[in-house]
């Protein structure tokens, strides 16, 4: 009992003595301050330290959902049960709405600046096509809404902009979108979503780049001279359409993720992309696990400097929603003006690039899966970043790549959870958190 009491007092003292690294704070009611998080985590950290020598059941081990937030694909409502699976469960992603608005504004700014030359056939209609990743994915929904809202082509349905694919809309008669008008230098243009579809392949995999490449071929064969702008929910699909048609025809293409190939392509005519701060996300994904395993304040090395000097700035690099137990990295627009700063998408973020002391943060084993080993962003950007941060955080991570189609392809490889100290899960579908928590609850 004396040992446990001492551990409890030491952990509490450690939490209360941490010094914040400052920076801007968000005004959102969903966001909590570093001080509030420190106080809220004090008891949790103390309890973790007190039981450090005890055998931890799988259901009580640290868990981080990432990239795909547990939620209903039909309504977008968060799965609070999954987000509160245990006291050390968190989600790490990015601020989807903020990023969606940035992408829409990036496209609009480009059109305004180049309206006279962007109208390729001079018909006064600036037509764009839209590649939709997954109609049931919150991030895809947000990006579709962001583009339509900013360009004025969105139609409200039940209080929000409809994110339903329009199909082919060359005549402007689709019900889920509308024509918008834009005046530039005294001339009025019509902005029209000529076509949009979900890029799902025959096997059921969404966000499919090959499907997007095929789609642009079909669209251009029918109304290619009317396409003035290409927009995509991500860079994987965007680059497929850019390489298949847009590059040779000098049609600006806008994506999302700031993948290395897309950033490099900006110098060749790719219009722009959005960095979702993958370096921050990857760090947070493993950092919340590291902190929980060490029994320290969850904010350590995030909004509060750790002993190595690692520290992010809340409101600049990320925001935290205490209610949702979710960390959201903030996005940055990448255009011709700044793309040279983003050419290496796998470089660790300078603010959190310091090695932890292994005597204080001993080696632990983590099971982590990527929902689709073929996903361009996750495989070429996110995982390489994770592999760099796992070294800095003294974590031995087993990386599991899924097929992008079924949860069972992943869960079948989680047959030995007792061998691991923590878990990081990237679901195929946001509805399917129970497929994983049921395994951890056995």
PLM regions: where:
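Sec-dependent N-terminal signal peptides of Gram-positive bacterial secreted proteins and lipoproteins
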Residues: 3-24
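A residue-level marker of the well-folded mature domains of exported/periplasmic proteins
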Residues: 21-442
């Amino acid at each position: 009992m004396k040992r446990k009491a001492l551990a409890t007092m030491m952990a509490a003292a450690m939490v209360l003595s941490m010094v914040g690294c400052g920076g801007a704070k968000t005004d959102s009611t969903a966001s909590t301050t570093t001080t509030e998080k420190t106080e809220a985590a004090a008891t949790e950290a103390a309890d973790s330290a007190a039981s450090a020598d005890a055998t931890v059941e799988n259901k009580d081990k640290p868990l981080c959902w990432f990239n795909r937030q547990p939620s209903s694909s039909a309504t977008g409502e968060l799965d609070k049960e999954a987000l509160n699976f245990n006291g050390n469960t968190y989600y790490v992603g990015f601020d989807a709405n903020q990023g969606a608005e940035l992408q829409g504004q990036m496209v609009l700014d480009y059109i305004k600046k180049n309206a006279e030359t962007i109208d390729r056939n001079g018909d006064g209609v600036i037509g764009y096509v839209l590649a939709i990743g997954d109609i049931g994915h919150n991030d895809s929904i947000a990006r579709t809404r962001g583009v339509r809202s900013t360009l004025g082509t969105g139609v409200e349905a039940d209080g929000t902009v409809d994110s339903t694919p329009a199909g082919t809309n060359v005549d402007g008669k689709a019900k889920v979108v509308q024509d918008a008008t834009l005046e530039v230098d005294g001339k009025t243009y019509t902005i029209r979503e000529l076509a949009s579809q979900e890029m799902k392949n025959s096997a059921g995999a969404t966000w499919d780049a090959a499907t997007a490449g095929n789609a642009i071929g079909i669209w251009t064969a029918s109304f290619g001279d009317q396409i003035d702008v290409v927009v995509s929910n991500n860079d994987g699909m965007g680059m497929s359409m850019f390489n298949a048609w847009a590059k040779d025809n000098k049609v600006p293409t806008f994506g999302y993720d700031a993948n290395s190939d897309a950033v490099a392509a900006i110098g060749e005519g790719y219009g722009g992309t959005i960095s979702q701060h993958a370096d921050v996300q990857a760090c947070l994904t493993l950092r919340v696990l590291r902190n929980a395993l060490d029994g320290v304040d969850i904010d350590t090395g995030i909004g509060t400097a750790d002993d190595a000097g690692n520290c992010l700035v809340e409101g600049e690099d990320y925001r935290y929603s205490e209610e949702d137990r979710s960390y959201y990295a903030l996005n940055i627009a990448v255009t011709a003006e700044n793309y040279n700063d983003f050419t290496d998408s796998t470089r660790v973020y300078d603010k959190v690039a310091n090695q932890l002391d292994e005597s204080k943060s001993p080696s632990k084993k983590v099971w982590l899966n990527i929902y689709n080993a073929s996903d361009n962003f996750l495989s070429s950007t996110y995982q390489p970043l994770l592999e760099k941060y796992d070294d800095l955080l003294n974590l031995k991570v087993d990386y599991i790549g899924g097929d992008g189609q079924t949860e069972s392809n992943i869960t079948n490889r989680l047959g030995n959870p007792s061998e691991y100290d923590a878990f990081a899960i990237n679901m195929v579908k946001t509805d399917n958190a129970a497929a994983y928590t049921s395994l951890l609850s056995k």
